[in-house]
A protein has these predicted regions:
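Amphipathic alpha-helical interaction surfaces in cytosolic regulatory modules
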Residues: 1-11, 25-41
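Short glycine-rich, basic-tinged beta-strand/loop micro-motifs
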Residues: 11-22
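C-terminal structural segments of small proteins and small subunits
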Residues: 31-60
Length: 60
C-alpha cells in the first residue's frame, strides 16, 4: 500500500519536490529501489530503525 500511495502523491507533485514515505513492511526497501529505477524518480535515501522504514524520493 505505501508504494501505491507514493505513486499517487508523486503524480500530484512538481518536479524537484521530495516525498518522504514511512512504511512498516521490510519489503518496502526493495520495492522503492525498484520503483525509483522504473519510474525515473530519484531515491535519495532510505533508513531502517528496526520497526519502520523511511524512504525519500525526488520527483523527476
Amino acid at each position: 500500500m505505501p508504494l501505491l500511495k507514493a505513486k499517487q502523491a508523486l503524480n500530484r507533485m512538481d518536479v524537484g519536490q521530495i516525498l518522504e514515505v514511512i512504511a512498516t513492511d521490510q519489503g518496502s526497501v526493495r520495492d522503492f529501489q525498484v520503483f525509483a529505477v522504473q519510474s525515473g524518480n530519484e531515491l535519495l535515501g532510505q533508513t531502517d530503525d528496526g520497526s519502520t522504514y523511511s524512504h525519500w524520493i525526488k520527483k523527476a
